[in-house]
């Protein structure tokens, strides 16, 4: 069986890991980095690029670059790239394909299965959309798990004793807080809360607005109206935010940011950490509400927490760390990388599913209450939030009118009292109920939540046994046919990418061979026969001509032909070199013999000597 990889599909960055020798290992991407920007773009030539290359060209190509698509998962939002509309699932699938490819390169084998993480506060439709994205990317999603839970898995893998931990997860676009009890290999989530629209992007936006307003006051130009200038502001804001985590002040310098009648204008502003804290104070405070709620739901006080784990790049912001420390009363744990820990936890869960890890039990919860709309537009809960999953609950309802032969089941998720204030997950109808006075028919509604947190609902007329059921689909409304089409499109793109890579490699090899051939011909002089040189020259010219066209097979064929001709040329060069070496060796041997002979040419050598008497001795 192939490896199951663990993927943290993030708003700003994504990460992939695998279990090796019982330990989670982060897989570096093709660019050599441990995280991959969640950015997709199309170049001016119509080539799709993902990750670091896409992020690098965003300033010069903002209209064809998509970031932070995770914020739109589970909605009917569409983006246009290269004159084509894409759903958030398709854009996410492109990021997943890149991670899949990098994992395959690292492992040296095909990867078809994955565990993907989502924010704990993701709704059913957002989870379903994530699963669809995996499928479009060619991955069977074995499990969807919550990001804070994954982080706890990575943290608690080698910990002894019972602990209560709080996972504070502030990513690029979402915020979650979860409370877990860890002990004897059991990871039990006791409460979770969060905000699906709060993250690092919001902190960046405060800096962007601050810079833009200052510039507008000085020059009367709003940089936010210019797509290219706005992209430069975004990059500068993100960089400044990161720098202010380690220094007290940073300089934001963007020369030639725009052009007015008076000439080019430059942006040059110093931003202090104190000013940044002032701009984002309310955002930091927004993280405290869900934190208090999670503690309240779990029936715990701040003093009951043994350890605080920070997850997500935005938790590097000093004001965030300070707020957590002040509220809980202890400094957060710093021994884990907040950008990688979620993917590592996903890899551990993948190991559990593959049977490679057998001493871990994960008990997760549903983040929001589930129920149906009843008479008067009331939201009637069947499953309360923070219920351990998988779970199943049923409740008997009845008709609201005489002789009612069908009932509409309106499935909802949320915490508000009225149905209209909660999130609609789906609707279906149970028909064929025998006419009867209101209150007589008995309709049993059953909710099942699987281990992925995905909801299945059924309604049954207890009188007739008639049953109707629904698996809640993403509210983006993707049908099975649409998903299948997207899978095929993604596969086609994958094949196109492989072909493009093959073409690049073939061209690079051919270019290199042409250069090497020209160099060899120049250096060989008259060491090889004219006939062989002419053949090599002809093969080289044919390859150069093939390189001017787009036929990859032709390039490969002409490359091989030139290689064959070069073999003959090389053979002659080696033979020539060998012959010269032998002649040189023979010449040296002859010279040595002459020297030895010359040392005794028959002449008498006179030697002076002195005779010594014995007495002088």
Swiss-Prot record:
The keyword Phosphoprotein applies. Residues 575-592 have a biased composition (Low complexity). SUPFAM superfamilies: Actin-like ATPase domain, Heat shock protein 70kD (HSP70), C-terminal subdomain, Heat shock protein 70kD (HSP70), peptide-binding domain. GO terms for molecular function: ATP binding; ATP-dependent protein folding chaperone; unfolded protein binding. Residues 575-617 are annotated as: Disordered. Residues 593-602 have a biased composition (Polar residues). The modification Phosphothreonine is found at residue 174. Residues 607-617 have a biased composition (Acidic residues). Induction: By stress conditions e.g. heat shock. Keywords: ATP-binding, Chaperone, Nucleotide-binding, Phosphoprotein, Stress response. The keyword Nucleotide-binding applies. Pfam families: HSP70 (PF00012). HAMAP family: DnaK. Acts as a chaperone. Belongs to the heat shock protein 70 family. This is Chaperone protein DnaK. It comes from Halothermothrix orenii (strain H 168 / OCM 544 / DSM 9562). The lineage of its organism: Bacteria, Bacillati, Bacillota, Clostridia, Halanaerobiales. The gene is dnaK.
């Amino acid at each position: 069986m192939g490896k199951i990889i663990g993927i943290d599909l993030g708003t700003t960055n994504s990460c992939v890991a695998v279990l090796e020798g019982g330990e989670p290992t982060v897989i570096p991407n093709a660019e050599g980095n441990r995280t991959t920007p969640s950015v997709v773009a199309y170049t001016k030539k119509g080539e799709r690029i993902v990750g670091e290359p896409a992020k690098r060209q965003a300033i010069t190509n903002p209209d064809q670059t998509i970031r932070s698509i995770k914020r739109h998962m589970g909605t009917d939002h569409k983006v246009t790239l290269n004159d084509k509309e894409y759903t958030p699932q398709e854009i996410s699938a492109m990021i997943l394909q890149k991670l899949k490819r990098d994992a395959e390169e690292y492992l040296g084998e095909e990867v078809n299965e994955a565990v993907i993480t989502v924010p704990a506060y993701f709704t059913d439709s957002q989870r379903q959309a994530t699963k669809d994205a995996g499928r479009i990317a060619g991955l069977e999603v074995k499990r969807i798990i919550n990001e804070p839970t994954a982080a706890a898995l990575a943290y608690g893998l080698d910990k002894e004793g019972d602990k209560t931990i709080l996972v504070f997860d502030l990513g690029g676009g979402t915020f979650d807080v979860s409370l877990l009890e860890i002990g004897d290999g059991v990871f039990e989530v006791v409460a979770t809360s969060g905000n699906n629209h709060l993250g690092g992007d919001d902190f960046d936006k405060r800096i962007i607005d601050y810079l833009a307003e200052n510039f507008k006051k000085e020059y009367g130009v709003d940089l936010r109206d210019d797509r290219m200038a706005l992209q430069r502001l975004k990059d500068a804001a993100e960089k400044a935010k990161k720098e202010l985590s380690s220094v007290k002040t940073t300089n934001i310098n963007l020369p030639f940011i725009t052009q007015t009648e008076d000439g080019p204008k430059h942006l040059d502003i110093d931003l202090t950490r104190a000013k940044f804290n002032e701009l984002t104070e309310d955002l930091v405070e927004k993280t405290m509400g869900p934190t208090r709620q999670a503690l309240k739901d779990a029936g715990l006080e701040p003093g009951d927490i043994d350890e605080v784990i920070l997850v997500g790049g935005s938790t590097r912001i000093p004001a965030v760390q300070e707020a957590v420390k002040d509220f809980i009363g202890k400094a957060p744990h710093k021994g884990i990388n907040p950008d990688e820990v979620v993917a590592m936890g996903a890899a551990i869960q993948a190991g559990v599913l593959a049977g490679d890890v057998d001493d871990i039990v994960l008990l997760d919860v549903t983040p929001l209450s589930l129920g149906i709309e009843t008479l008067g537009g009331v939201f009637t809960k069947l499953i309360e939030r923070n219920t351990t999953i998988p779970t199943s609950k049923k409740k008997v309802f009845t008709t609201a009118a005489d002789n009612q032969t069908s009932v509409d089941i309106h499935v909802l998720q949320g915490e508000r009292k009225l149905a209209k204030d909660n999130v609609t997950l789906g609707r279906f109808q149970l028909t064929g109920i025998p006419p009867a006075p209101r209150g007589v028919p008995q309709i049993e509604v059953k909710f099942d939540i699987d281990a992925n947190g995905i909801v299945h609902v059924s309604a049954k007329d207890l009188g007739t046994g008639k049953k109707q059921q629904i698996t809640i689909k993403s509210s983006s409304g993707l049908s099975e046919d649409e998903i299948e089409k997207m899978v095929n499109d993604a596969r086609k793109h994958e094949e196109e990418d492989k072909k493009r890579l093959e073409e690049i490699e073939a061209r690079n090899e051919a270019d290199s061979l042409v250069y090497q051939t020209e160099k060899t011909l120049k250096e060989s002089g008259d060491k090889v026969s004219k006939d062989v040189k002419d053949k090599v020259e002809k093969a080289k010219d044919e390859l150069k001509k093939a390189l001017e066209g787009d036929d990859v097979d032709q390039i490969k064929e002409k490359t091989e032909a030139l290689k064959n001709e070069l073999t003959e040329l090389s053979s002659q060069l080696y033979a020539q070199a060998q012959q010269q070496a032998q002649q040189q060796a023979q010449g040296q041997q002859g010279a040595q013999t002459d020297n030895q002979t010359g040392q005794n040419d028959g002449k008498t050598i006179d030697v002076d000597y002195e005779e010594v008497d014995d007495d002088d001795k």
